[in-house]
Regions:
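Gly/Ser-rich "nucleophile elbow"/oxyanion-hole loop immediately N-terminal to the catalytic nucleophile
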Residues: 156-175
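Serine-hydrolase catalytic-loop signature spanning alpha/beta hydrolases and amidase-signature enzymes
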Residues: 104-107, 128, 154
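Alpha/beta-hydrolase active-site loop
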Residues: 140-161, 183
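Active-site loop/turn elements of alpha/beta-hydrolase fold enzymes
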Residues: 102, 126, 133-135
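Short amphipathic alpha-helix adjacent to the substrate-entry channel of hydrolases
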Residues: 110-129
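Glycine-rich nucleophile elbow surrounding the catalytic serine of serine-hydrolase chemistry
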Residues: 173-183
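Short beta-strand element of the alpha/beta-hydrolase
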Residues: 94-102
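N-terminal cap/lid segment of alpha/beta-hydrolase-fold proteins
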Residues: 32-92, 141
Length: 185
Protein backbone atom coordinates (compact mmCIF):
# COMPACT_ATOMS: atom_id res chain seq x y z
CA UNK A 1 0.00 0.00 0.00
CA UNK A 2 2.47 2.64 1.14
CA UNK A 3 5.60 3.46 -0.83
CA UNK A 4 7.39 4.83 2.21
CA UNK A 5 8.46 2.52 4.99
CA UNK A 6 9.27 5.17 7.57
CA UNK A 7 7.38 3.31 10.27
CA UNK A 8 7.71 -0.35 11.22
CA UNK A 9 6.28 -2.60 13.91
CA UNK A 10 9.27 -1.60 16.06
CA UNK A 11 8.59 2.14 15.80
CA UNK A 12 7.45 3.62 19.09
CA UNK A 13 4.07 5.34 19.23
CA UNK A 14 6.06 8.32 20.56
CA UNK A 15 8.01 8.49 17.28
CA UNK A 16 4.78 8.46 15.28
CA UNK A 17 3.15 11.19 17.39
CA UNK A 18 6.25 13.37 17.11
CA UNK A 19 6.93 12.77 13.42
CA UNK A 20 7.07 16.17 11.64
CA UNK A 21 4.39 15.32 9.08
CA UNK A 22 1.91 14.46 11.84
CA UNK A 23 2.52 17.61 13.90
CA UNK A 24 -0.88 19.05 12.94
CA UNK A 25 -2.71 15.72 13.13
CA UNK A 26 -1.89 14.23 16.55
CA UNK A 27 -5.52 14.42 17.61
CA UNK A 28 -6.57 12.61 14.42
CA UNK A 29 -4.10 9.80 15.06
CA UNK A 30 -5.37 9.20 18.56
CA UNK A 31 -7.71 11.73 20.12
CA UNK A 32 -7.35 11.01 23.83
CA UNK A 33 -4.39 12.83 25.42
CA UNK A 34 -4.31 10.34 28.25
CA UNK A 35 -4.08 7.37 25.87
CA UNK A 36 -1.48 9.21 23.75
CA UNK A 37 0.62 9.65 26.89
CA UNK A 38 0.33 6.00 27.90
CA UNK A 39 1.08 4.67 24.41
CA UNK A 40 4.32 6.59 23.97
CA UNK A 41 6.53 3.95 25.59
CA UNK A 42 5.19 1.10 23.44
CA UNK A 43 6.16 0.01 19.92
CA UNK A 44 3.49 -0.25 17.22
CA UNK A 45 3.67 -4.06 17.46
CA UNK A 46 1.83 -3.71 20.78
CA UNK A 47 -1.21 -2.27 18.98
CA UNK A 48 -3.01 -5.63 18.88
CA UNK A 49 -3.24 -5.96 22.66
CA UNK A 50 -3.28 -2.24 23.49
CA UNK A 51 -5.86 -1.07 20.97
CA UNK A 52 -7.20 -4.20 19.28
CA UNK A 53 -5.66 -3.08 15.95
CA UNK A 54 -3.85 -5.30 13.48
CA UNK A 55 -0.20 -4.19 13.58
CA UNK A 56 0.45 -4.72 9.86
CA UNK A 57 -2.62 -2.69 8.88
CA UNK A 58 -1.72 0.04 11.38
CA UNK A 59 1.87 0.32 10.10
CA UNK A 60 0.69 0.34 6.45
CA UNK A 61 -1.88 3.02 7.28
CA UNK A 62 0.62 5.26 9.07
CA UNK A 63 3.12 4.93 6.20
CA UNK A 64 0.41 5.72 3.64
CA UNK A 65 -0.73 8.78 5.63
CA UNK A 66 2.88 9.92 5.97
CA UNK A 67 3.34 9.59 2.20
CA UNK A 68 0.15 11.54 1.47
CA UNK A 69 1.11 14.41 3.75
CA UNK A 70 4.70 14.63 2.51
CA UNK A 71 3.57 14.47 -1.14
CA UNK A 72 1.16 17.34 -0.42
CA UNK A 73 -1.84 15.21 -1.38
CA UNK A 74 -4.94 17.02 -0.17
CA UNK A 75 -5.14 15.42 3.27
CA UNK A 76 -7.60 17.54 5.23
CA UNK A 77 -10.15 20.11 4.15
CA UNK A 78 -11.49 22.27 6.99
CA UNK A 79 -15.20 22.99 6.57
CA UNK A 80 -15.69 24.78 9.86
CA UNK A 81 -13.73 25.75 12.93
CA UNK A 82 -13.90 22.20 14.34
CA UNK A 83 -15.09 20.16 11.38
CA UNK A 84 -13.85 19.01 8.03
CA UNK A 85 -13.25 16.11 5.68
CA UNK A 86 -10.30 13.83 4.94
CA UNK A 87 -10.52 12.80 1.25
CA UNK A 88 -9.24 9.37 0.17
CA UNK A 89 -9.90 9.68 -3.55
CA UNK A 90 -9.08 7.10 -6.19
CA UNK A 91 -11.17 8.83 -8.87
CA UNK A 92 -12.22 6.82 -11.90
CA UNK A 93 -15.88 7.81 -11.50
CA UNK A 94 -16.14 5.24 -8.70
CA UNK A 95 -18.81 5.58 -6.01
CA UNK A 96 -17.98 6.90 -2.56
CA UNK A 97 -18.53 6.23 1.12
CA UNK A 98 -18.63 8.96 3.75
CA UNK A 99 -17.20 7.41 6.92
CA UNK A 100 -18.20 8.86 10.27
CA UNK A 101 -15.94 7.59 13.07
CA UNK A 102 -17.24 7.15 16.59
CA UNK A 103 -15.98 8.54 19.86
CA UNK A 104 -19.03 8.97 22.13
CA UNK A 105 -19.50 12.52 20.81
CA UNK A 106 -16.51 13.37 23.03
CA UNK A 107 -13.78 12.75 20.43
CA UNK A 108 -13.45 11.36 16.91
CA UNK A 109 -11.57 8.04 16.53
CA UNK A 110 -10.26 8.96 13.11
CA UNK A 111 -7.30 6.57 12.81
CA UNK A 112 -8.97 3.21 13.25
CA UNK A 113 -12.57 4.03 12.31
CA UNK A 114 -11.71 6.50 9.57
CA UNK A 115 -8.29 6.30 7.93
CA UNK A 116 -7.87 2.52 8.18
CA UNK A 117 -11.38 1.95 6.80
CA UNK A 118 -10.94 4.55 4.04
CA UNK A 119 -7.79 2.85 2.77
CA UNK A 120 -9.54 -0.55 2.87
CA UNK A 121 -12.41 0.92 0.83
CA UNK A 122 -9.91 2.40 -1.65
CA UNK A 123 -8.45 -1.09 -2.15
CA UNK A 124 -11.98 -2.34 -2.88
CA UNK A 125 -12.51 0.34 -5.54
CA UNK A 126 -14.44 2.95 -3.55
CA UNK A 127 -13.61 6.59 -3.01
CA UNK A 128 -13.79 7.36 0.70
CA UNK A 129 -14.14 10.49 2.79
CA UNK A 130 -13.73 10.67 6.55
CA UNK A 131 -15.94 13.17 8.36
CA UNK A 132 -14.55 15.17 11.27
CA UNK A 133 -17.54 16.50 13.16
CA UNK A 134 -17.99 18.67 16.22
CA UNK A 135 -17.72 16.89 19.55
CA UNK A 136 -17.67 17.73 23.24
CA UNK A 137 -19.32 21.02 24.14
CA UNK A 138 -19.90 21.71 20.43
CA UNK A 139 -21.80 18.44 19.81
CA UNK A 140 -25.26 19.86 20.53
CA UNK A 141 -27.96 19.05 17.99
CA UNK A 142 -27.90 19.87 15.10
CA UNK A 143 -24.17 20.69 14.91
CA UNK A 144 -22.86 17.17 14.10
CA UNK A 145 -25.65 16.68 11.53
CA UNK A 146 -24.74 20.02 9.97
CA UNK A 147 -21.12 18.82 9.73
CA UNK A 148 -22.23 15.69 7.85
CA UNK A 149 -24.24 17.93 5.51
CA UNK A 150 -21.18 20.16 4.98
CA UNK A 151 -19.03 17.12 4.13
CA UNK A 152 -21.55 15.82 1.62
CA UNK A 153 -22.00 19.28 0.11
CA UNK A 154 -18.22 19.61 -0.33
CA UNK A 155 -18.00 16.15 -1.92
CA UNK A 156 -20.84 16.90 -4.36
CA UNK A 157 -19.41 20.33 -5.24
CA UNK A 158 -15.96 18.87 -5.95
CA UNK A 159 -17.02 15.51 -7.41
CA UNK A 160 -16.32 16.34 -11.06
CA UNK A 161 -12.80 17.56 -10.30
CA UNK A 162 -12.09 14.46 -8.17
CA UNK A 163 -13.84 12.10 -10.65
CA UNK A 164 -16.17 10.80 -7.95
CA UNK A 165 -19.54 9.23 -8.82
CA UNK A 166 -22.23 10.92 -6.71
CA UNK A 167 -25.08 8.74 -7.98
CA UNK A 168 -23.93 5.79 -5.89
CA UNK A 169 -22.78 6.54 -2.37
CA UNK A 170 -23.18 5.44 1.21
CA UNK A 171 -22.96 7.17 4.57
CA UNK A 172 -21.81 4.87 7.36
CA UNK A 173 -20.43 5.25 10.82
CA UNK A 174 -19.20 3.54 13.94
CA UNK A 175 -20.65 3.93 17.42
CA UNK A 176 -21.54 7.64 17.80
CA UNK A 177 -20.72 7.98 14.10
CA UNK A 178 -23.20 5.18 13.38
CA UNK A 179 -25.82 7.09 15.35
CA UNK A 180 -24.99 10.18 13.34
CA UNK A 181 -25.18 8.25 10.04
CA UNK A 182 -28.56 6.78 11.03
CA UNK A 183 -29.77 10.25 12.04
CA UNK A 184 -28.75 11.49 8.61
CA UNK A 185 -31.08 9.00 7.01
Amino acid sequence: MARNSKFSKNTLFYQVFHSPEFADYQEALYPSRMIRSLLQIYPLRASRWLLGLDTTVLVDTLNCLSDRIRQKTEFYVPLGESSGVYPFVIGGRKPFVLLIPGGAYAEVCTLNEGFMMALALNRMGWNAFVCKYRVGKEAHFPNPQDDVADCLQWIFQNAAQMEVNTEDYAVCGFSAGGHLAASWG
